[in-house]
A protein has these predicted regions:
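Conserved loop->alpha-helix
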Residues: 1-117
């Protein structure tokens, strides 16, 4: 589970294409404390599972369904992704409890600038 509060951004340093899977290698230098294989990390709001860790480089696999329903399918090397680690017992719930399981993507058709806020 996630709060929806983004911790920061991290760069994609490598993308590998395999049979039916795209593997993203992300430099999680600032966000890899106690990270383990099998852990959940939200990349641009999408719940992803850690499949490999080498120093600060963390790999995530995405299947075609994930790539077609999210913005992950449009990412390239050097793209930055929003990062959020999953909740742990005792963590502050500063946002909203969300699962990170994406149903679809939507296109923003208008942004209204209301001085200090954007809608």
């Amino acid at each position: 589970m996630f709060t929806g509060i983004v911790s920061g951004t991290a760069p994609i340093v490598k993308i590998e294409e395999k049979d039916f899977i795209r593997t993203f290698t992300v430099d999680l230098d600032k966000y890899d404390d106690n990270l383990e294989i099998g852990a959940s990390v939200a990349l641009d709001g999408v719940c992803m599972t850690v499949v490999s860790i080498e120093n600060n480089l963390v790999k995530f696999d995405a299947i075609e369904e994930t790539l077609s329903r999210t913005t992950l399918g449009k990412l390239s090397v050097d793209s930055s992704v929003n990062i959020e680690r999953s909740l742990k017992m005792g963590d502050e719930l500063g946002g909203h409890i969300i699962s990170g399981h994406v149903l679809m993507s939507a296109k923003i058709i208008q942004i209204k600038d209301l001085s200090l806020i954007h809608i």
